[in-house]
Amino acid sequence: MDSIQQRRGGIVSLSPAQTPRSSDKSARESRSSESNSTNRNDKEKGVNVQVILRCRPLSEDEARIHTPVVISCNENRREVAATQSIAGKHIDRHFAFDKVFGPASQQKDLYDQAICPIVFEVLEGYNCTIFAYGQTGTGKTYTMEGGARKKNGEFPSDAGVIPRAVKQIFDILEAQGAEYSMKVTFLELYNEEISDLLAPEETIKFVDEKSKKSIALMEDGKGSVFVRGLEEEIVSTANEIYKILEKGSAKRRTAETLLNKQSSRSHSIFSITIHIKENTPEGEEMIKCGKLNLVDLAGSENISRSGAREGRAREAGEINKSLLTLGRVINALVEHSGHIPYRDSKLTRLLRESLGGKTKTCVIATISPSIHCLEETLSTLDYAHRAKNIKNKPEINQKMMKSAVMKDLYSEIDRLKQEVYAAREKNGIYIPKDRYIQEEAEKKAMAEKIERLELQSESKDKRVVDLQELYNSQQILTAELSEKLEKTEKKLEETEHSLFDLEEKYRQANATIKEKEFVISNLLKSEKSLVERAFQLRTELESASSDVSNLFSKIERKDKIEDGNRFLIQKFQSQLTQQLELLHKTVASSVTQQEVQLKHMEEDMESFVSTKSEATEELRDRLSKLKRVYGSGIEALDNIAVKLDGNSQSTFSSLNSEVSKHSHELENVFKGFASEADMLLQDLQSSLNKQEEKLITFAQQQRKAHSRAVDTARSVSKVTVEFFKTLDTHATKLTGIVEEAQTVNHKKLSEFENKFEECAANEERQLLEKVAELLANSNARKKNLVQMAVHDLRESASTRTTTLQHEMSTMQDSTSSIKAEWSIHMEKTESSHHEDTSAVESGKKAMQEVLLNCLEKTEMSAHQWRKAQESLVSLERNNVASVDSIVRGGMDANENLRSQFSTAVSSSLDVFDAANSSLLTSIDHSLQLDNDACTKVNSMIIPCCEDLIELKSDHNHKIIEITENAGKCLLDEYVVDEPSCSTPKKRPIDIPSIESIEELRTPASEELLRAFRDEKLSKQANGDAKQQQQQQQQHLIRASSLYEAAVSDSRYPLSAVN
């Protein structure tokens, strides 16, 4: 009792991985989850229902009789083609689905490609539904449940969607290491009654099964549907679910039909609810809920083909009714109807959320490839193809906090405790009185039944002993008779062979006679039918001939009336011709008048054109004068531009001469510097030569005693030579710098000349458009150009000056370094040769004199370089002043030319304004002439319009007169043929159809013989030979009628026979 209460009420310990609830609480929570869901995924709104099609292979019986296949599946293109024969033509209908699986597909292929993603979405928190739909015997239950489990517990290869989904769910949850709880429900819908397949088996069965109350289907206020009192099994492993599934499937109602040996007679819904615990970043524990509904629908069936009778027929009717309601719901959803008939069936109420609701739905449509099931297959394909267009709006279920779940569970436990206390108040299990009486009666009946079965068992045991003894005696007798039987069989075979030959000959002769009689009877019957039909046709021909004579008389009367009408029409034609000629004359006179007026208008237009040409000539003369005035102004501007060009060229030439003069003066200055430097070097060389002679003499005197002094003197001589070589290289560098500066100046002057010429050319081109503005811009550009050139010259001069200063400083540094080296050398010589002081003093004095002479020469060269620098600076200042004076003179000349140009422009503008005013007066005069010409033309057009109006009125009167004459002739005088009532009325003629004529023809003899032989074989199979001989004539007549109905389409036409 406690285990039953634990399963029903869900009273278990509240571990983190298990949060079970009772059935009522589950329904309330599911409704709350649907109404309060806030975690919506915008991408999943408006998702179409996924439709998968699966075609089963041919059964063994179908393959044995070679049943034609009318369904072809293209899995790559996801398309199904159904071959249908209409009016003798084969027509293929194509249907496209989300996934297509042909007869060769396996359970694993279907699950991996179509169902596996749906299971992942369930674990993400969605509600998903998978249901199989199709005709009975097409494999719905096999697809959903698969084959039976193996005894060793291995997972079967042909497992269906439900066991594979369960296995995948547990594998994923175990791999993630998640804390979860799972519960399942399994219900059955049979004859519109819901029963729980997981309800516990009670020890006492109900006497009448109909007295068992079905489970109630309830709705909340928000449109959701839930089943009250449904059992929920809490599971923790996949094997538990497999056992529950086997137990529930065993309780389902199944029966054998002609189409399926084990056909499901009810709909089943297997639901799996999963609660998964998650931890938020804030550390709170949340419960995520997902639900998977796996629906196995009962198949629609044709009662005539399934062989259902009585109770089974009622079951089939209820199944077809619920599936028909499902089809109506699908049609209404696809057509967006205002009313969806969910409440017409409990099946559609249960699937309400799956069709157009918040659930992700997958439909597996199963079909048969056999031609015998083509009608049901096409119906399934149409409904499945329509279901593709249903749009659901799936939403993720709201995550619940663990504390809220535990609070609800505690309140549920308190409620169940109160119910248990109320039930056990009276020291035992309390049950109703009626139930107790019923159970006692059933116990008594059960005891009586057990006694009766025991008696039957004893009697059957005695009978078994007797039968065993009889069996032993029969075995001995069988062994004796078997030998006799073998001998008798050999004789029998010989006799049978001879008898078979005689019977075969007799049968052939008798069959030939009967066949001839059958053919003759059919020929006589056809002859009689032909004679009767010929008499009928003769009667129809006589009545038709009388009708033809009456028609000829009517045609003669109509000819007379037509002759009178033809004369009347000719008379009307002559009158109409006369009136049209009169109308033509009137129109011709009006046209001549208009031609005269047009001639007058033409003359006026010619005078207008001559006046207009004179005014045009006058305008042309004025324009030529204006052109001459404009040309004179342009010539004046050209003269000013020429003067400006001359002034610019003179300015540039003076500037060029000044620059060349500056370069010549600079060259002369550097030549003077070079000559002075050469003289200085020559003096130094001569002094050095003298010093060398003195040193040689001194060395010869002191060679023996002072060899080290000679070496030192040689080193001094080397240093001095190097110094003068350095001085020579610096002088060479100075000469190169001067030449480089000269070339740079020439290059910049040439660039300045090119820029000046380009600027002058541009100004000359632009002076004609914007003279005043461009003159100011020209002066500014020229001033900038000259300033830039002067600036460049200054920079080059300053650069050269700095270069010269650098060379001078380098020379001074080298001189000072040599001086320092010399002093060091003297100190060393003085310290090392102290003992030779007397001899060295004379040489020292001479060397001091030479050194002083060298210092004087050095100071003199430094003075010369300073003078050169000062002269360069003064030359630069003079050059800048001269260039500034030249530029100022050019700017003053350009200013004078600009004033002259502005006066010339103003005078040209005055002349142009005067010419423009005179041109405007001439244009006004021309416009006045145009207005005068328009008034004259209007004065001519007005009388023309009046004449046209008068002509229009006369033309209308003539037309009215012609219309009256036509009506009088064609309506009053025209004779109409009156009916004489002698014309034969239309009556239906009994024309024999081609089918009736074909029915009169006797079938071919081969066909008659074939039908006769078939009828004879069927009668022989029934073993009624005597009755066949007595009723031979009746059988022949029946075989003839059957033959005519069978071969009516293949008869020859009667014309071909004749």
Curated annotation (Swiss-Prot):
Record's compositionally biased regions (Basic and acidic residues): 22-32
Coiled coil location: 438-517
GO cellular component: cytoplasm; mitotic spindle; spindle microtubule
Binding positions for ATP per the UniProt entry: G134, Q135, T136, G137, T138, G139, K140, T141
Entry's localization field: Cytoplasm, Cytoskeleton; Cytoplasm, Cytoskeleton, Spindle
Domain Kinesin motor residues, every copy: 48-390
InterPro entries reported in the protein's UniProt record: KIF11-like, KIF11-like_kin_motor_dom, Kinesin_motor_CS, Kinesin_motor_dom, Kinesin_motor_dom_sf, P-loop_NTPase
Annotated keywords: ATP-binding, Coiled coil, Cytoplasm, Cytoskeleton, Microtubule, Motor protein, Nucleotide-binding
Gene Ontology biological-process annotations: microtubule-based movement; mitotic spindle assembly; spindle elongation
A GO molecular-function descriptor: plus-end-directed microtubule motor activity
Annotated function: Responsible for microtubule translocation. May be important for the organization of phragmoplast-specific arrays of microtubules. Plays an essential role in stabilizing the mitotic spindle. Required during mitotic cytokinesis.
Protein name: Kinesin-like protein KIN-5D
Native source organism of the sequence: Arabidopsis thaliana (Mouse-ear cress)
